[in-house]
Amino acid sequence: MTDLPALLVAAPIFGSVTVLLAGLLRERTGWPLTVLASLVQVGGAVALAAQAFGDEPVRYVVGGFTAPFGIELVVDGLSATMVVLIAVVSLGVLGYARAAGPRSNVFYATYLLLVAGLTGMSITSDVFNMYVFLEITGLAAYALVASGEGGESALAALKYLLVGTVGASLFLLGIGYAYIGTGTLNMTDLSGQLATLGYTTPLVQASFGLLVAGLFVKIAVFPVHTWQPDAYANAPDSVSAFISALVSTVAAYALARIVFSVFTVEFLLANAFAQSVLVAGAVVSIVFGSVLAVTQTELKRMLAYSSVSQFGLVVGAIAVANGTALTGAMIHLVGHAIMKGGLFLTCGLVATETGARTVEEYDGLVERFPLGAGAFAVLAFAMVGVPPAVGFVGKWYVALGAVEAAAAALAVVVLV
């Protein structure tokens, strides 16, 4: 048994505390310590992924208390991909933050705390432990959004806090219902207990509904997306890039884990209505997110609404629950994280160089800042799914999966 899973959660937490304490002695310690912690995170993530892509998942039992009574961390190929994505993206955005800000020790400490929360959500095999990391992620994200200058950032963070608290509370209630019916929190054990209890039992159905509703808020699926446009638009550019790339991405990954590792495909087969609601929610999110995106004048707000649409696609893939669609969902999750983070970073660079932040102000950008215009164009085309970009590949597999599942409405909105 390797200690790497635990170290990948503990290292950024330790780094966060170290940054705060070192800052009491010397002001400019936050940057080098955060870079060091991030490099350790990347190295550990790559090493763990190399093991996880072997024959069996990597498992770590916290405190020596074996599952189902103790907390188990499990890293398979899917969660290893998420861990590497989190580590690499966070290091990349950190480099931009050094130039564009914020640069305070509190910012760096909170940044590392968010990395810890996202990593923990990705590798835990305990639903209550997932809730704990969900809360850590939320609190760190709220603080980072509020780190911008001016009252708009604080107001956006407050809105994010209020809506996010509702989502976390729904998720916790869902855990409570599951625990009442089964007496366990370990995902593997819980899956078996739920099957024994019966997938059509009202308690099991209520637990599923609450867990999914809570994660819908965190993912920002329409119409519970209201926190996202303000948060992305008013946060510092580096924070917008960081949270847009990873926060909803990891929440969508958590949804996939809850649906397939805890409730399983058999639950969806036994509850056709629940599956239909998931598909309908995905279709609505794709359509309304796209419509709202094209009506925006501010670039960052447009990109935020684009995320509402893009994650509707991922939710739809999870809902149809076949291998083709899920392959597309995972490709799209990784691709979206890189593309959307890159788009927000490009918006920040363009604003720094030219002051342009609206669609109208981007007119003639190719003459004023050709590098920024080129980068934005390439990333935007990839995002909308122009072949052969990764955005096209993910959408194509999701559409094929929707056709296989006879989900015609989903297939149409994905392809259109």
Task: Identify what each model region corresponds to.
Residues 22, 26-29, 103-113, 117-200, ...:
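Alpha-helical multi-pass transmembrane bundles of energy-transducing inner-membrane proteins
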Residues 30-35, 155-159, 235-245, 327, ...:
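Membrane-interface alpha-helices at helix entry/exit sites of multi-pass transporters
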Residues 64, 209-277, 304:
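Short helix-boundary/re-entrant hairpin motifs in multi-pass inner-membrane proteins
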Residues 2-109:
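Transmembrane helix-loop-helix hairpins at membrane boundaries of multipass inner-membrane proteins
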Residues 1-2, 63-81, 192-208, 271-276, ...:
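Short aromatic-rich membrane-water interface segments that cap or initiate transmembrane helices
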Residues 6, 10, 50-54, 59-61, ...:
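Specific lipid-exposed transmembrane alpha-helices and their immediate membrane-water interface residues
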Residues 144, 232, 315-324, 394-411:
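Interfacial segments of multi-pass membrane proteins
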Residues 54-72, 183-198, 258-271, 327-328, ...:
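Membrane-interface helix termini and inter-helical loops of multi-pass transporters
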